[in-house]
Structure formats: C-alpha cells, structure tokens
C-alpha cells in the first residue's frame, strides 16, 4: 500500500527545490514509497511522482505485483516503456531524476522531449529516507537485537584452531536461523594482523594464541539492515593491545555521548578522532567515523570531518572508530545509534570492553 506520509515528505522536498515532478527508480525507494518490492535487473521500474495528483507506477508484466497500490502502466519486453513515461511527464516543467536511473532509459526520454529540463533530485528521497519513521525504527531495533544475539553466540563459538572462514560461515548460518533475509554485507572476521585491514575478507587464517579477533557483522531483517563491530583477544592481550582497545572504546563512547538533535556530524567525528590523535594513533584511524544505514548497509550520509549536516531525530548511523596497525593488529568498536528528541538510543547492547575468547 502507498506510504502516504513518506510520499508527502518527498513532495514537500520537491517543492522546496522548485520541482513539480520526479521519476523515482531506485527499487528500495520505490518500495519505501509504495510498498512494491521489485528487483528489475535490466528492465525498467519507475514511479512517476507529481507534487499534485496521483503517482504512476511503470511495471513490467513479469514483475510479481498482483495488486499495485496506485495507477499502473504495464509493459512487456517488446514494448517501449520510455515512450509510456514520455506521455505522462509534463515536458514543459523541470523533471527530477533519480541518480539510479540508467542512461539507457534517461537519454531516450530526453531525446523524446529535447527541451525538457532534467534535474538530479535523488536528495528529495534520500534525505527523507535518512530520518526513519516509527515503523522503520522498530524494524532496525529488531535487526540489531538479532545482530547482538548472533555476535554473542559467535563469541562463545570461536576456538583457537578455527579459521576465519569457519567462523564467518557460522555467523551467516545463525542469521538464517533467526529468520533473516541474509547478512547485510560480507561478514568480516579478522584474526591478528588481518584486522589491520578494515575491509578484510575472511580466509583460511587460523586463530592462535595472542591474536586479536574482530567481528564486523550485520543482518537484514524485514528489509532493514544492522551493523556492529566488536574486537576481542585470543588469550590475555598484551599491554599495547589492551591500551589500544580501551582507547578505541573510549573514542566510541565520547562520540555517542555528544549525539543529540542539532549537533553537527563533523563534531562527532572530531570527538572520537581527537581522542585517538592525542594518544598518538591518529594516523592509524584512516576512515570516517560512521555511515548512515537503513535498507542498505551504506545509505546516503556519513559521519565525517567534511559533513556539517546537523543530526535530526530519526537518523540512524554507525559510530565506529578504529586503530589499524599494519603487521600487528587492528581494533574497531561499532554501534548503530538512533537520534532521539533528546539524545540518542544505542541500538547495540553487547559489552564493548575487551574480553578473552577462543579458550
């Protein structure tokens, strides 16, 4: 069914940009506004959204949509769906276009209406998606609850002698056992020096005494993603390992303590980064502090030194400082946080302190 409140927010954003119409084609944005879940692959999927009047869906008859929620124009593989869209748009007014729309559809539309102004207007949808409504918040809490549970299960499952691949496969199987659609990204399990690569892919590295153990994991539940990272040690950590872990955890907590409506996202990055830099590890924190998340694990928006956007209620993003020492080890501690009216809600509840695993 149509998500009228969400659609009204997008329409208001279009009006604010001086637009009266938009083509939405990102499948996740189409679902967000209409409830129609389609993966079009090479075929055309589009939602024509005017600021006044009824929206129009353009669907291939191969798509399994038995009861479309609004006016629908159907096409087959031998039809010309762009010509159908050309009949609906108002060529005398600027047309907002989704950044995801392939050139093979956009260019023929522009050739059909050569005088029509085309404007990139993805932000009108993306900025609305950035602030989750109550339904979305509930779904993301549940995805994070499952992530916490599987993280805890993996923490107790892991033993010295296991490979990264074995443990990552266990985590993915646990997600399926909890009824998830799957992992929200390739599960990261990193032992020892492998953890100094923030995006290491699990391989046949065997866990041994003295290694750090980094899990970066997330699941998709009800179409919404979770994401978290915890770092532990196989055996008692060295003094340096424990100190770096404590530093990263404190950086995570320092940023989270500042979160409330109106704070600039760059201020959160600075709070974590300054702490790590003052301890002498600034050069080894080599990525932004966080990213937005929702139907995908990385949505538009980040928590970085360059982003002066202010936090608004409903935003959900990660806080994930890290220190990565090549050839030695890496530590990252990550939570998802929901901006509330008065502060923030940390969606991940698992302990962030270092612990000994694998025994």
Predicted regions and their residues:
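Active-site neighborhoods and metal-handling regions in enzymes and metal-associated proteins
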Residues: 1-359
